[in-house]
Structure formats: C-alpha cells, structure tokens
Amino acid sequence: MAIKSLNDLLAEGVSGKGVLVRSDLNVPLEYLDGNIAHISDPGRIVASVPTIRALAGAGAKVIVTAHLGRPDGKPDPKLSLAPVGAALGELLGQHVQVAGDVVGTDALARAEGLTDGDVLLLENIRFDPRETSKDDAQRLALARELAELVGGPTGTGGAFVSDGFGVVHRKQASVYDVATLLPHYAGGLVAAEVEVLRVLTASTERPYAVVLGGSKVSDKLAVIESLATKADSLVIGGGMCFTFLAAQGLPVGKSLVQLEMVDTCKRLLDTYADVIHLPMDIVAADEFAADSPSEIVAADAIPDSKMGLDIGPESVKRFAAVLSNAKTIFWNGPMGVFEFPAFAAGTRGVAEAIIAATEKGAFSVVGGGDSAAAVRALDLPDDGFSHISTGGGASLEYLEGKVLPGIDVLED
C-alpha cells in the first residue's frame, strides 16, 4: 500500500495552510539547581528538525504535538515541553511558540494567530488523558480538537504529518486517530525509518547478525523468536543473558534472572543452538552500584555473592569476530550497565565492532532506545553506523511482524 510523503504534501502546496506534525520529542530531561532544565541527549529533537523546517520554510502554519515522559493524563510542570520548545527553536533558527495547554484556550488562541512559516508547539499531549485512552470515542474527541487547530471549526482545511517514529506502534489520538480525520503524510523521519526496517526484513544481505541486550527476556521474547529464524547469528548480552545462562544450568549468583522465562530460554537454546551466541565471561560486582568492586569471571563460574553487570573482554572478542563477517547488523540493547563507567566496556566494545564492520561495508542499524542513548553517552560517532533509529519499541514490533497502528493508518 502507498503512503504519501512529505514531498507529496510540499508539492501540493502548504503556503498559508495549517499542518499538524506529530513529532517524537521525548528526550531525557532533568532540572538542575531546581529550575534549570538540562536535555542530556537532544537526538530526537535534532531528528525532528528537517520536517518542521521544510514545512515552515514552505509557508505552512506548523503546529507540533508531542509527549514527554509519562504524566498519567494530568499536567506535571517537570514534564512540560517548554524547555524542549526552546531547544527546538535554537535548532530551527526561529522562534517557536509553546502553548500553555494541549487543546485549550491558549493553544486555540495561538493557533488562530499563526502567520505563514510560524511554528507552535502544543503542551505535552499526554497531559490530556484522552491521548492514551483505550476508549475509541475519547481518543477521537481529542483528535477532532487537534484537527480543528489546523483545519478550522470543521477540521477539514489542514493536513497531518506523522514524524514521530518512536510512537507509531501506539494507537493514540495524536498518532492514529487524527490521521483518520485529516489528509495524512509520512514525515521525512518516519519514511526513512520504515525504509530502513524494510531493508532488514525484505532485502537483507547476508550474513545477518543481530545483537540484543537489555535487562529482560520477556521484553524481547517475540523479537528473539522472530529474528532467530531469520538471522545467521543472534548475539545476546545485557541483563537478559543471565536468564539464558541459568537455562543452561550455570550458576549466576545474584544476577538478574527471570525465573519464569528459564524454560523458554532453554527451548530457544535447544532450537537455535547454531544461531545464539552467549557471553564467555562476565564483569561481576558485589552490588548494583557504580563504585562496587568488580572482577572478571567465567560465564560458568559466577560466584554466589556477585552479580553480573557487563560482559567481559573475551565475550567482546567473540562477539566482534561474529560481527566482523556480517553484511547486515541490527543492534538493540546495551551489553551492560553502560551508565556506570566500570561496566561500560562491553557495550563500547560491541559498538566499536559494529562500527568497524560498517567501515568494511556492512549495513548497520542501531534500534533506538537505550542503544542510541549508549552511543551518545559513550561519545561514539553517530555516523559510524548506517542508521540510528529514533524508535526502540517501534523498531522491535516492526521486526516482530506486528502491524504498527501509526503506519497502517497512513496507508492509502
């Protein structure tokens, strides 16, 4: 099925037209010294700029909607998009208005006062409980109010651009329902993300290596099941590797283990023994703390008193050897607690192996989420990878073969 693109909309002409853009601006935000907002990783804001800039530059009246965190359907000053709006304005090189509400009197007044090329950012869409409601009627009611901001009282004069790939797996008012009311288009970011994932699923060059990390097997069971049948190698690290080690009957000490998933991991190991690669050694510590004393131990000899917080150097070498031969690589999830410098070497080592493979011609995709955060936290070059996704959960669900509501609704 065809999806209309941002270029299609620009070709139709947007000068003087209201355009609602659903962006993904969910960035890590903390307040320093009480009131000074600090965005530690502006990657998603940066990725949102090209679509917004193209529309504003073509004379559209651009209204951006996005979420930040999980405010549980009510206003939370610490989750206001005001600091994000300031950062967006700096990147765009123009003033970005920030409404004091989602679809209330301030948003409506500001929308009515927009001139060609202006940009307005609505307040955190999740301040309105209807955004994430399971009730179709409630979501549709909010979607109508959003549509009216760009299309007037009838909501028919504007357009909708979906450019928040990180939320396209959610059936939410600003992602799905509003697209049923307005002419809809995929923004440049969403179109690029979908194209990359189609390469991973439809035209993968082999050998195909998948690297999965993170803490819980249950979070990635479906994608493990799916990719184990498609990949030539499935490298598993992070906290979830300990459930696999436990499934082999090995001692894991105080490491994170999902006991209810042990039998499932055993089945996976039996079925895909030639595909799955587990760590050979572990960086173990006394407790989950940045300054906890650590030692490198064999993966089959983790002491009862210790917990694994990273993969060891021999594991990095083994995984790097697998990756060095790959032509296609998908990575989702860190190999250890990269936020603690003492336990970041595994993630860094595997990431550098992916970069080296990319330099040799491999097509590499970082699957968003914590993996993308690790790339930036460890000061690794974004351009060392073929593509860094802005949507961890959306990427995984696409690779599982699930229908993504925010993509499905765009298809004509």
Curated annotation (Swiss-Prot):
SUPFAM superfamilies xrefs: Phosphoglycerate kinase (SSF53748)
Give the metabolic or biological pathway. Carbohydrate degradation; glycolysis; pyruvate from D-glyceraldehyde 3-phosphate: step 2/5
Domain of life of the native organism: Bacteria
Where is it located? Cytoplasm
Q: Which reaction does it catalyse?
A: (2R)-3-phosphoglycerate + ATP = (2R)-3-phospho-glyceroyl phosphate + ADP
Q: Identify one Gene Ontology CC term for this UniProt entry.
A: cytosol
The alphabetized UniProt keywords are: ATP-binding, Cytoplasm, Glycolysis, Kinase, Nucleotide-binding, Transferase
Provide one Gene Ontology biological process annotation.
Answer: gluconeogenesis
CDD domains from the xrefs?
Phosphoglycerate_kinase (cd00318)
Q: Name one GO molecular function term.
A: phosphoglycerate kinase activity
Q: What is its EC number?
A: 2.7.2.3
Q: What is this protein called?
A: Phosphoglycerate kinase
The species is Mycobacteroides abscessus (strain ATCC 19977 / DSM 44196 / CCUG 20993 / CIP 104536 / JCM 13569 / NCTC 13031 / TMC 1543 / L948)
